[in-house]
């Protein structure tokens, strides 16, 4: 029979396994693109069986969606840290912009081509980009209040420029 406390141990290791799979998949997808990476390779890179992988994630698209969500969560945590440690809005914008460019350069161009073939994951990514655009506009407005930017700066235009840059990079 099952010993006491065995079940709880199993469920925490399950959560850890899920995290490990997502981390490995993020790394593999961003480095190589999505299409070229198989569930077999993800399992092999973790030293787990394919069956174990499929028990946690039924298919590649579900795993990809979780990867996107994980990246967004990491992004939110990063931005929060930047806000807490920056002396003004301009510094926040520069540090975040630099970080997004670094992240972009660390990502294989194929990733951005491949993700369009996964509608739900692609939508998640686009929603997040729209959200960070709104955040950017709010930051510029805050910057005007702090007297860092002139108030005749057109936020929407600046924001579109920043976004177009990222869109150009991603396409």
Language-model-derived ranges and their functions:
Residues 14, 18, 64, 68, ...:
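Amphipathic, non-transmembrane alpha-helical scaffold segments
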Residues 24, 28, 52, 99, ...:
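Amphipathic alpha-helical interface segments
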Residues 66, 77-106, 159-162:
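Hydrophobic alpha-helical connector segments
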Residues 150-171:
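Hydrophobic alpha-helical segments that form the core
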Residues 1-32, 36-45, 62-65:
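Basic, helix-initiating cap at the start of DNA-binding domains
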Residues 47-57:
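Short hydrophobic/aromatic patch on the recognition helix
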Residues 98-138, 148, 156-157:
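Short secondary-structure transition hinges
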């Amino acid at each position: 029979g099952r010993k006491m406390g065995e079940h709880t141990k199993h469920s925490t290791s399950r959560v850890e396994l899920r995290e490990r799979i997502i981390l490995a998949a993020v790394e593999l997808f961003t480095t190589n693109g999505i299409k070229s990476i198989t569930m077999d390779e993800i399992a092999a890179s973790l030293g787990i069986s394919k069956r174990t992988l499929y028990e946690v994630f039924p298919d590649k698209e579900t795993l990809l969606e979780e990867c996107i969500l994980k990246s967004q969560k990491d992004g939110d945590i990063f931005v929060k840290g930047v806000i807490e440690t920056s002396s003004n809005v301009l510094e926040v914008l520069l540090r975040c912009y630099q970080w997004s460019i670094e992240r972009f350069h660390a990502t294989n161009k194929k990733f951005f081509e491949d993700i369009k073939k996964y509608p739900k994951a692609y939508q998640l990514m686009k929603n997040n980009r729209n959200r960070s655009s709104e955040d950017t506009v709010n930051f510029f407005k805050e910057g005007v209040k702090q007297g860092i930017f002139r108030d005749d700066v057109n936020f929407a235009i600046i924001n579109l420029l920043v976004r177009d840059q990222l869109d150009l990079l991603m396409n």
